[in-house]
């Protein structure tokens, strides 16, 4: 049985190293792997011994914590209906722009994100008790990247406006939704922290069964927003938008004169519980574990308008191309805006984990019972790699 357990853990650790989410599982035997310190010798006392003091029971570890999520499995967390203008029904020509919102099927409902990445570098600090329990925290910085279909971000605009003017009416609302485009965003590098606890619950020879619980939080700002859409393509550096505001947006939305806007930021929260089994083989301690986690990315459903000019130049305020191929903007004529997309905007919808369960496989290398390096990969609910290097005082 021992040989079988050794074979399974070693094979899993080595074979997974070639395939690289945001909280690692960690080695379940970590609280008891480093039993000696660089400044103070370890003490393996009995907690029931009346002569044992808390000074003998407590030790500290510090080190580097790196977690690199290459693809988190996310989906949107939105309502089934979305308020915007009625869908156009005219077969030819233009029509009056809608001025009232109606409930339509939300194209963002249940959408899967194409890519979600997060990279964290932090300092790791752990308080160890009786070489069996760890209470730890990380303090560092994180940055992220999100990419998805434009429908996931409720990219909308107004098409076919029959007005004879260089701007749309004040009460006009969008009537078209885009689902054949791509939206991507990059966040800045911002402060991130996490706390957790880990315990070696059961030991039998060289095998250890352990459990852990962790919570992480960060709130990065959106550094750059790219909308890759043939009808309305644009890029915004440090975008700002409206929170809690329904259509119609102000006519100044997207211009330098816009008011009532705030910086776009994403509030990230995640909790995770895990159970793992390890087996020590001299310097190496491979392990395999399962985890249950829930992550949320909430940007307050901020709505960001396409950048445009406050006053028209050459009878246009944006560089959006013609849709039906008119080839020119006819000034002082009905429908002069009808062939280009107007009042384009999108919103950053709340996202959550699409899968809750995942597996983690890794190994820890211990040197002189004072130093340790852990390498881990995680699969199913995310694809990620984790590195932890630490020493005991």
UniProtKB/Swiss-Prot annotation:
GO terms for cellular component: cell outer membrane; pore complex. Its main location: membrane. Keywords: Cell outer membrane, Cell shape, Disulfide bond, Ion transport, Membrane, Porin, Signal, Transmembrane, Transmembrane beta strand, Transport. Transmembrane segments: none annotated. It comes from the Bacteria. It is found in: Cell outer membrane. It is a multi-pass membrane protein. GO terms for biological process: monoatomic ion transport; regulation of cell shape. Residues 1-22 form the signal peptide. One of its GO terms (molecular function) is porin activity. Part of a disulfide cross-linked outer membrane complex (COMC) composed of the major outer membrane porin (MOMP), the small cysteine-rich protein (OmcA) and the large cysteine-rich periplasmic protein (OmcB). In elementary bodies (EBs, the infectious stage, which is able to survive outside the host cell) provides the structural integrity of the outer envelope through disulfide cross-links with the small cysteine-rich protein and the large cysteine-rich periplasmic protein. It has been described in publications as the Sarkosyl-insoluble COMC (Chlamydia outer membrane complex), and serves as the functional equivalent of peptidoglycan. Permits diffusion of specific solutes through the outer membrane. Belongs to the chlamydial porin (CP) (TC 1.B.2) family. This is Major outer membrane porin, serovar L1.
């Amino acid at each position: 049985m021992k040989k079988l357990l050794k074979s399974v853990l070693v094979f899993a650790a080595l074979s997974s190293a070639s395939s690289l989410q945001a909280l690692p599982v960690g080695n379940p035997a970590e609280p008891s792997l480093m039993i000696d310190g660089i400044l103070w010798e370890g003490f393996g006392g009995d907690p029931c011994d009346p002569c044992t003091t808390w000074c003998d029971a407590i030790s500290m570890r510090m080190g580097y914590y790196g977690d690199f999520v290459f693809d988190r499995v996310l989906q949107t967390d939105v309502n089934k209906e979305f308020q915007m203008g009625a869908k156009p029904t005219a077969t030819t020509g233009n029509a009056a722009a809608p001025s009232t919102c109606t409930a339509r099927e939300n194209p963002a409902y249940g959408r899967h994100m194409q890519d979600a990445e997060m990279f964290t570098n932090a300092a790791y600090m752990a308080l160890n008790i009786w070489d069996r329990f760890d209470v730890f925290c990380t303090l560092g910085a994180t940055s992220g990247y999100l990419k998805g279909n434009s429908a996931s971000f409720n990219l909308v605009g107004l098409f076919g406006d029959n007005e004879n003017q260089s701007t749309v009416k004040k009460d006009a609302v969008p009537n078209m939704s885009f689902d054949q485009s791509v939206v991507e965003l990059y966040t800045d590098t911002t402060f991130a922290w996490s706390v957790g606890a880990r315990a070696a619950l059961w030991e039998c020879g060289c095998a250890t069964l352990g459990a852990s619980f962790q919570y992480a939080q960060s709130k990065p700002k959106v550094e750059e927003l790219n909308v890759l859409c043939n009808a309305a393509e644009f890029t915004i550096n440090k975008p700002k938008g409206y929170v809690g505001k329904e259509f119609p947006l102000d006519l100044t939305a997207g211009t330098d004169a816009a008011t009532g806007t705030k910086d776009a930021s994403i509030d990230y929260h995640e909790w995770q519980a895990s159970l793992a089994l390890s087996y020590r083989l001299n310097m190496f301690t491979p392990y395999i574990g399962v985890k249950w986690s829930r992550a949320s990315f909430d940007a307050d459903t901020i709505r960001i308008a396409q950048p445009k000019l406050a006053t028209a130049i050459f009878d246009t305020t944006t560089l959006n191309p013609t849709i039906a191929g008119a080839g020119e903007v006819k000034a002082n004529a009905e429908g002069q805006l009808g062939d280009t997309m107007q009042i384009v905007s999108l919103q950053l919808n709340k996202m959550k984990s699409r899968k809750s369960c995942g597996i983690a496989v890794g190994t820890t290398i211990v040197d002189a019972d004072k130093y340790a390096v852990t390498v881990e990969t995680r699969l199913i609910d995310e694809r990620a790699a984790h590195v932890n290097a630490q020493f005991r005082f």
